From Swiss-Prot:
Gene3D superfamilies: Calcium-transporting ATPase, cytoplasmic domain N, Calcium-transporting ATPase, cytoplasmic transduction domain A, HAD superfamily/HAD-like. This is Potassium-transporting ATPase ATP-binding subunit. GO terms for molecular function: ATP binding; ATP hydrolysis activity; magnesium ion binding; P-type potassium transmembrane transporter activity. It is found in: Cell membrane. The active site is at 313 (4-aspartylphosphate intermediate). The keyword ATP-binding applies. Keywords: ATP-binding, Cell membrane, Ion transport, Magnesium, Membrane, Metal-binding, Nucleotide-binding, Phosphoprotein, Potassium, Potassium transport, Translocase, Transmembrane, Transmembrane helix, Transport. Mg(2+) binds at residues 524, 528. HAMAP family: KdpB. It catalyses: K(+)(out) + ATP + H2O = K(+)(in) + ADP + phosphate + H(+). It comes from Clostridium botulinum (strain Eklund 17B / Type B).
């Protein structure tokens, strides 16, 4: 999925785009873009005018008509090329995905109870609800849910990520994708999609653009462009009638030529944005694909650009996902070294990230090295949900660590004393957003291990940037309100939802939407599905359940919760690019007006030469220069349309001011300079 990332295009893509540019000359394809269809019709009209001029029926020189005709056809081809090069990126990605989509032999069974009764069938014949067995070395034949077993799966063909992932029955890691490969153990999978409707099929369809529909914003902009084009068409027709009247009044034989008026119409029509509009939308989808995010619709990308509420999971997005030991706090005058030694002993067999961090902290702070856990006199007590403690029996002593209330009951049951000091330390750590683990030896409390949520580096700056953009961030966590408040304050989020439930998340999203906000969120579990279905931008993790993926309108193939921030940036960049190029395109008309209008009427009204502020060489050179610029600017802006306008984390007001300056004022100045340069060049080489 990361193919061509960061590249404008390669030779193969350019070659295919050139070929497609000519294929797109069919009337059916041209009619899909009304603005460029006008240029297409104009090209046909001038071609006919040139043909009849060869037999003596003309209102301009044949060479002039031929020149305008060639430039108009080149303009149409450039517009086709812009769209084809954008589509080419998607086709290149689709080709790599098709390579992963192979018809393989599937081992179908009737039920879990009859695992030995295997029927070999083609993966293309599998239906929703079928059960298959996939062993190490085999490709997963279809999308499904793991209903038995656990295995490492290579998903690089889909995600581009070489590291294998674990897929297992139950929980939020049960979804598997057809085209991935099992590299260890065995999975029993229930198929969840019909043939041709798999996740891979949807990906191919989306990246190729076959399933892409115009978004409401695109439709609204296209209506504006069509309206402007109709206005300019009426103006041009009126000018022709006016030129006939003026010619008769002045006693001049020839009014303005039809060819010149066609050139005027094409120059005044918003052809630049008309040619690039489709490319901008396709490129936005492509940038998401390059970020390993699959958008189910262009509407979702646009919504991401308008989002003003971001609901972010604490774990994995704001924090690293694992709490780490950061301090040993002894009580009852216990030596800190003794507490660290006991805490490390109780954690030697603890393979959780928290347990390993205790071992590391004791080593770093006191130089206490881990002992051999295979010593015969060590009996490790594993953590269970029932006991809420873990520990070790060692040298006739019982060392335990766990939740405060559990350890308190343990100590008191053995005739020990649980001090008020320990309660105060536990409360203080909880208020800071940390997790206290109390450590006891036999019937004596030694102290507390402070486990802290580690805030990801740089998230405070990211949230500050989002705030500048007018986006409110809300942290979603299952922690208690005190812990949630402390972490939210440290991370710099605007608000939080503590002890979050599926119902609570859904209610919060609805409340914001009623107030007119657009909400984005991420999720991976079945319990996230209702909220994902309600959110305007819903990013489901690829590692998540099938229900979550179906509820979301985007799927993150990397399963990175922080990707939501990048998605919002891409959405805003898409909207900015479209707006900036629209502004530039319309601003261009002013310069082209000063180039062509004096050239058209200077024969009838010599006084209009005062409007020739660019001092263009002649009427013909003015028209040629304007229409050549009109074609070249399309090609010049293709890289910007594909890469997008550079996005900055500033307020909408500042962005608008900057873009009006760059693309509004720039859209006026650039054509004045370019048209003058073209006029000098074509005059120097004798074209006119």
């Amino acid at each position: 999925m990361n193919e061509n990332k960061g590249n404008f295009a390669n030779k193969k893509m350019i070659k295919r785009a050139v070929k497609d540019s000519f294929i797109k000359l069919s009337p059916k394809t041209q009619m899909e873009n009304p603005v460029m269809f006008l240029v297409y019709i104009s090209s046909i009209l001038t071609t006919v005018l040139y043909a009849v001029s060869l037999v003596g029926i003309r209102d301009s020189k044949s060479s002039f008509i031929l020149g305008i005709t060639i430039i108009l056809w080149i303009t149409v081809l450039f517009a086709n090329f812009a769209e084809a090069i954008a589509e080419g990126r998607g086709k290149a990605q689709a080709d790599s995905l098709r390579a992963a989509k192979k018809d393989v032999e599937a081992h179908k069974i009737i039920s879990l109870e009859k695992k030995d009764e295997i029927t070999k069938v083609s993966s293309a014949l599998l239906k929703k609800g079928d059960i298959v067995i996939v062993v190490a070395g085999e490709q997963v034949p279809a999308d499904g849910e793991v209903i038995d077993g656990a295995a490492s799966v290579d998903e690089s063909a889909i995600t581009g990520e070489s590291a294998p992932v674990i897929r297992e029955s139950g929980g939020d890691r049960s979804a598997v994708t057809g085209g991935t490969t099992v590299i260890s153990d065995r999975l029993i999978i229930q198929v969840t999609s019909e043939a041709g409707e798999s996740f891979l099929d949807k990906m191919i369809s989306m990246v190729e653009g076959a399933a892409r529909k115009k978004t409401p914003n695109e439709i609204a902009l296209q209506i504006l462009l069509i309206s402007l084009t109709i206005i300019f068409l009426l103006v041009t027709v009126s000018l022709y009638s006016y030129s006939i009247f003026s010619a008769n009044q002045a006693g001049v034989v020839n009014p303005i030529s039809v060819t010149s008026l066609v050139a005027l119409l094409v120059c005044l029509a918003p052809t630049t944005i008309g040619a690039l509009l489709s490319s901008i939308g396709i490129a936005g989808m492509s940038r998401l694909n390059q970020a390993n995010v699959l958008a189910m619709s262009g509407r979702a990308i646009e919504a991401a650009g308008d989002v003003d509420i971001l609901m972010l999971d604490k774990t994995g997005t704001i924090t690293l996902g694992n709490r780490e030991a950061c301090e040993f706090i002894p009580v009852n005058r216990v030596d800190e070294n003794e507490l660290a030694d006991a805490a490390q002993l109780s954690s030697l067999a603890d393979e959780t990230p928290e347990g390993r961090s205790i071992v590391v902290l004791a080593k770093e702070k006191f130089g206490i090295r881990g002992r051999n856990i295979r010593e015969s006199n060590m009996e490790f007590i594993p953590f269970t949900a029932k006991t809420r403690m873990s520990g070790v029996n060692y040298n006739n002593s019982e060392i335990r660590k766990g939740a405060a209330e559990t350890v308190k009951d343990y100590v008191i049951s053995r005739g020990g004393y649980y001090s008020k000091e320990c309660d105060e330390i536990v409360a203080r750590i909880s208020n800071k957003g940390g997790t206290p683990l109390v450590v006891a030896k036999d019937n004596k409390v030694l102290g507390v291990v402070y486990l802290k949520d580690i805030i990801k580096q740089g998230v405070q700056e990211k949230f500050a940037d989002l705030r500048k953009m007018g986006i409110k961030t809300i942290m979603i966590t299952g922690d208690n309100p005190l812990t949630a408040a402390a972490i939210a304050a440290e991370a710099g989020v605007d608000d939080f939802l503590a002890e979050a439930t599926p119902e609570g998340k859904l209610e919060m999203i609805r409340d914001f939407q009623v107030k007119g906000h657009l909400v984005a969120m991420t999720g991976d579990g079945t319990n996230d599905a209702p909220a994902l279905a309600q959110a305007d931008v819903a990013v489901a993790m690829n590692t998540g359940t099938q229900a979550a993926k179906e509820a979301g309108n985007m799927v993150d193939l990397d399963s990175s919760p922080t990707k939501l921030i990048d998605i919002v940036r891409i959405g805003k960049q898409l909207l900015m690019t479209r707006g900036s190029l629209t502004t530039f395109s319309i601003a261009n008309d002013l310069a082209k007006y000063f180039a062509i209008i004096p050239a058209l009427f200077i024969g009838l009204y010599p006084g209009l030469s005062a409007l020739n502020i660019m001092n263009l060489h002649s009427a013909e050179s003015a028209i040629f220069s304007a229409i050549i610029y009109n074609a070249l600017i399309i090609v010049a802006l293709i890289p910007l349309a594909l890469k997008g306008v550079k996005y900055r984390e500033v307020s909408a007001g500042k962005l608008l001011s900057r873009n009006l300056l760059v693309y509004g004022l720039g859209g006026i100045i650039v054509p004045f300079i370019a048209i003058k340069v073209i006029d000098v060049l074509i005059t120097a080489i004798g074209i006119v």
